[in-house]
Protein backbone atom coordinates (compact mmCIF):
# COMPACT_ATOMS: atom_id res chain seq x y z
CA UNK A 1 0.00 0.00 0.00
CA UNK A 2 2.80 2.43 0.87
CA UNK A 3 4.44 1.80 -2.49
CA UNK A 4 1.19 2.77 -4.19
CA UNK A 5 0.85 6.03 -2.24
CA UNK A 6 4.29 7.39 -3.14
CA UNK A 7 3.63 7.59 -6.91
CA UNK A 8 0.10 8.89 -6.27
CA UNK A 9 1.34 11.69 -4.01
CA UNK A 10 4.13 12.51 -6.47
CA UNK A 11 1.63 12.66 -9.33
CA UNK A 12 -0.68 14.98 -7.39
CA UNK A 13 2.21 17.26 -6.43
CA UNK A 14 3.41 17.47 -10.04
CA UNK A 15 -0.14 18.06 -11.30
CA UNK A 16 -0.68 20.87 -8.82
CA UNK A 17 2.70 22.47 -9.46
CA UNK A 18 2.11 22.33 -13.22
CA UNK A 19 -1.42 23.72 -13.00
CA UNK A 20 -2.14 26.84 -14.99
CA UNK A 21 -4.90 29.39 -14.81
CA UNK A 22 -7.71 28.86 -17.32
CA UNK A 23 -9.28 32.31 -17.06
CA UNK A 24 -7.94 35.79 -16.48
CA UNK A 25 -7.36 36.46 -12.76
CA UNK A 26 -8.08 40.19 -13.21
CA UNK A 27 -10.98 40.32 -15.69
CA UNK A 28 -12.72 37.38 -14.08
CA UNK A 29 -14.55 35.15 -16.52
CA UNK A 30 -12.59 36.30 -19.56
CA UNK A 31 -10.78 33.63 -21.55
CA UNK A 32 -7.02 33.75 -21.52
CA UNK A 33 -4.96 34.66 -24.58
CA UNK A 34 -1.96 32.30 -24.77
CA UNK A 35 0.16 35.21 -26.04
CA UNK A 36 -0.58 37.33 -22.94
CA UNK A 37 1.63 35.45 -20.51
CA UNK A 38 4.18 36.33 -17.84
CA UNK A 39 6.43 34.16 -15.74
CA UNK A 40 6.50 34.70 -11.99
CA UNK A 41 8.48 32.53 -9.55
CA UNK A 42 8.95 29.96 -12.32
CA UNK A 43 5.21 29.71 -13.05
CA UNK A 44 3.40 30.91 -16.15
CA UNK A 45 0.40 33.18 -15.63
CA UNK A 46 -1.99 33.82 -18.51
CA UNK A 47 -4.19 36.87 -19.04
CA UNK A 48 -6.86 38.02 -21.46
CA UNK A 49 -5.07 41.20 -22.59
CA UNK A 50 -2.05 43.47 -22.26
CA UNK A 51 -3.93 45.75 -19.84
CA UNK A 52 -4.22 42.89 -17.34
CA UNK A 53 -0.52 42.07 -17.73
CA UNK A 54 0.29 45.68 -16.79
CA UNK A 55 -1.95 45.45 -13.71
CA UNK A 56 -0.27 42.16 -12.74
CA UNK A 57 3.21 43.65 -13.13
CA UNK A 58 2.41 46.32 -10.53
CA UNK A 59 1.30 43.93 -7.78
CA UNK A 60 1.50 40.18 -8.56
CA UNK A 61 1.53 38.99 -4.95
CA UNK A 62 -1.65 40.92 -4.19
CA UNK A 63 -3.43 39.26 -7.12
CA UNK A 64 -2.19 35.79 -6.13
CA UNK A 65 -3.52 36.26 -2.59
CA UNK A 66 -6.82 37.82 -3.73
CA UNK A 67 -7.59 35.20 -6.41
CA UNK A 68 -6.12 31.86 -5.27
CA UNK A 69 -8.78 29.73 -6.99
CA UNK A 70 -7.98 31.33 -10.35
CA UNK A 71 -4.22 30.86 -9.89
CA UNK A 72 -3.75 27.18 -8.93
CA UNK A 73 -0.12 27.24 -10.05
CA UNK A 74 0.74 29.10 -6.82
CA UNK A 75 -1.05 26.68 -4.49
CA UNK A 76 1.09 25.89 -1.45
CA UNK A 77 3.52 28.76 -2.14
CA UNK A 78 2.10 31.27 0.37
CA UNK A 79 5.13 31.16 2.65
CA UNK A 80 7.67 31.27 -0.20
CA UNK A 81 5.89 34.27 -1.74
CA UNK A 82 5.44 36.04 1.59
CA UNK A 83 1.68 36.32 1.10
CA UNK A 84 1.18 36.68 4.85
CA UNK A 85 2.65 40.18 4.48
CA UNK A 86 0.14 41.12 1.74
CA UNK A 87 -2.87 42.98 3.12
CA UNK A 88 -6.04 42.61 1.07
CA UNK A 89 -8.50 45.45 0.56
CA UNK A 90 -12.04 44.99 1.86
CA UNK A 91 -13.29 45.66 -1.68
CA UNK A 92 -12.36 42.92 -4.17
CA UNK A 93 -14.29 43.79 -7.33
CA UNK A 94 -15.12 47.07 -9.05
CA UNK A 95 -18.57 48.68 -8.86
CA UNK A 96 -18.72 49.82 -12.51
CA UNK A 97 -17.08 46.85 -14.23
CA UNK A 98 -17.87 44.41 -11.44
CA UNK A 99 -16.17 41.37 -12.99
CA UNK A 100 -12.77 43.04 -12.59
CA UNK A 101 -10.46 42.73 -9.61
CA UNK A 102 -9.31 45.81 -7.72
CA UNK A 103 -5.79 46.23 -6.38
CA UNK A 104 -4.24 48.93 -4.20
CA UNK A 105 -3.03 50.48 -7.49
CA UNK A 106 -6.53 50.84 -8.99
CA UNK A 107 -7.92 54.36 -9.57
CA UNK A 108 -10.03 55.59 -6.66
CA UNK A 109 -12.83 57.96 -5.75
CA UNK A 110 -13.95 59.05 -2.28
CA UNK A 111 -17.52 58.19 -1.29
CA UNK A 112 -18.84 59.07 2.18
CA UNK A 113 -15.25 59.43 3.36
CA UNK A 114 -14.34 55.93 2.15
CA UNK A 115 -12.14 54.93 -0.77
CA UNK A 116 -13.87 53.14 -3.65
CA UNK A 117 -11.71 51.48 -6.29
CA UNK A 118 -12.58 51.73 -9.99
CA UNK A 119 -11.10 50.35 -13.21
CA UNK A 120 -9.95 53.32 -15.29
CA UNK A 121 -10.86 56.88 -16.38
CA UNK A 122 -13.76 55.57 -18.43
CA UNK A 123 -15.17 53.83 -15.35
CA UNK A 124 -14.66 57.02 -13.35
CA UNK A 125 -16.66 59.02 -15.94
CA UNK A 126 -19.46 56.44 -15.88
CA UNK A 127 -19.43 56.38 -12.08
CA UNK A 128 -19.53 60.19 -11.83
CA UNK A 129 -22.59 60.38 -14.14
CA UNK A 130 -24.65 58.27 -11.77
CA UNK A 131 -22.75 57.43 -8.57
CA UNK A 132 -25.89 56.57 -6.59
CA UNK A 133 -26.87 53.91 -9.13
CA UNK A 134 -23.48 52.21 -9.00
CA UNK A 135 -23.13 52.50 -5.23
CA UNK A 136 -26.59 51.10 -4.51
CA UNK A 137 -26.16 48.18 -6.91
CA UNK A 138 -22.62 47.41 -5.72
CA UNK A 139 -23.65 47.43 -2.04
CA UNK A 140 -26.56 45.06 -2.80
CA UNK A 141 -24.12 42.75 -4.60
CA UNK A 142 -21.67 42.89 -1.70
CA UNK A 143 -18.99 44.65 -3.76
CA UNK A 144 -18.46 47.64 -1.46
CA UNK A 145 -18.12 46.31 2.08
CA UNK A 146 -16.36 49.51 3.13
CA UNK A 147 -19.63 51.42 2.53
CA UNK A 148 -21.95 48.75 3.90
CA UNK A 149 -20.24 48.71 7.30
CA UNK A 150 -22.11 50.49 10.04
CA UNK A 151 -20.50 52.13 12.99
Name the predicted role of every residue range:
Residues 1-3, 29:
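N-terminal leader/targeting segments
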Residues 3-14:
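Sec-dependent N-terminal signal peptides
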Residues 17-151:
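Intrinsically disordered, low-complexity terminal tails/loops enriched in metal-binding residues
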Amino acid sequence: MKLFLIPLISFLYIAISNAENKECPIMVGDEIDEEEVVEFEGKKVYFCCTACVKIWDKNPKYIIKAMPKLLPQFSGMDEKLGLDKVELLDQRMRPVYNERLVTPDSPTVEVEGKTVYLYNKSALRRFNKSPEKYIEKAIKEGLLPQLAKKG
